[in-house]
Structures are given as C-alpha cells and as structure tokens.
Amino acid sequence: MMRTLEVRRHTMRRKPGQRPAQDGIKLARLVRDESGHFDPVVSSDVPRAIETTIAIGYEVREIDPMLGHLPDDVFDAGVWPASFDKVERAVASEGPISRFADEQSRIWTGIVQKIPDGGKALVVTHGLFVEAGAIASLPEADHGSWGGAIGYCEGVRLTFDGAFEICQILHVPYGRHLVAN
C-alpha cells in the first residue's frame, strides 16, 4: 500500500530574524487549506521551520536537527538557490552535495517507513534540502522537468511503496512564489 511524504520549505521570515513574517504566516495557512491530515509531522530544529509547521496548523511531533544542518562544504559550494537540473548536476558530482542529498533521502525514507499504509507524513525543512533530497530519492527521474528552485512553503509530494516512486512538485498559488526575501 502506498504511503505519502510531503516535504515543504519553511515560510518567509523577517530578516535578519528567525521568526516568520506576517505574509509568511498567511502563506502557510494557504498550504494548510490544501494539505489534509498528516501523521507524523517532522521539522528541522530551526525556529522558522518549527513555526512554519505550527502556522500550517500542525503540532511538531518530531524534530530532526539533520533536516536543518547544512554542512559548511555544501554551503560553500554555492549551489542554492538553483533549479532542480542545476542541483542534479551538483549531486551527480559525487562531492559534498551528493553525500548531503543521500543523507536527506535516508532521513526521508526513515520517516515514511514509520507511517502506516495509506498514511501521510509532513516534513518542514529548508531550500536545497528539498531539491537535493528529492533528487536523491528518485535518481532516475527527469529532474530538469521539475522546474526552478523551491520557493517558500513549496515542496514535493513523494509516493512510497518500498521505495520512492513518484514526485509531484508542490507550488503555492500563482503570484505567491518567492525564493528569497
């Protein structure tokens, strides 16, 4: 039986702070209205991800620091923000981004394996985490067709039946796409 994992990027914040901006809270509520029920709900340990989860309307059941830890060598590679095909090329290089992507996919697999057949889990994480994890989860997919960088509250919906099988790119309503603020 299929299981579903939805992985979303956090909402926009009021920089330089970590707290979501009012527009970010509104955007998270739009996601809530289209998402349905999730169990479990997992977040990175970064406050903006936790607060996005709450703004979407869910209690954070589990916090995984690795969903928010970007290794220095991955950050220094300067890959993000970037389209899925650019991230795919970085993942294919078998360097730090490849290892990072594989780690995200392993975390996601561990989460989806915990849910019952027919269940859905939500992960709230960060830019590049979404793109890299999705690419590593479905390495044979046509990543170029997946589009540009994931914006705030956007993400992927992956189906799982022993392995990840299908990836649907999740967008916010037209006119609300924003990668950086």
Residues covered by each model-derived region:
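Active-site-proximal alpha-helix that buttresses catalytic centers in soluble enzyme cores
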Residues: 1-64, 70-71, 78, 87-97, ...
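Acidic, low-complexity terminal tails and accessory targeting/binding regions
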Residues: 2, 69-79, 117, 135-181
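Beta-strand elements within well-structured catalytic alpha/beta cores of enzymes
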Residues: 3-8, 42, 115-129
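Histidine-centered active-site/metal-ligand motif
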Residues: 10, 126, 174-177
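Short active-site segment of divalent metal-dependent hydrolases/proteases
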Residues: 13, 129-130
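Conserved glycosyltransferase catalytic-site signature
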Residues: 46, 50, 105, 127
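Short amphipathic alpha-helical segments
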Residues: 53-55, 134-137
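Internal catalytic-core helix/loop-beta-alpha segment
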Residues: 86-118
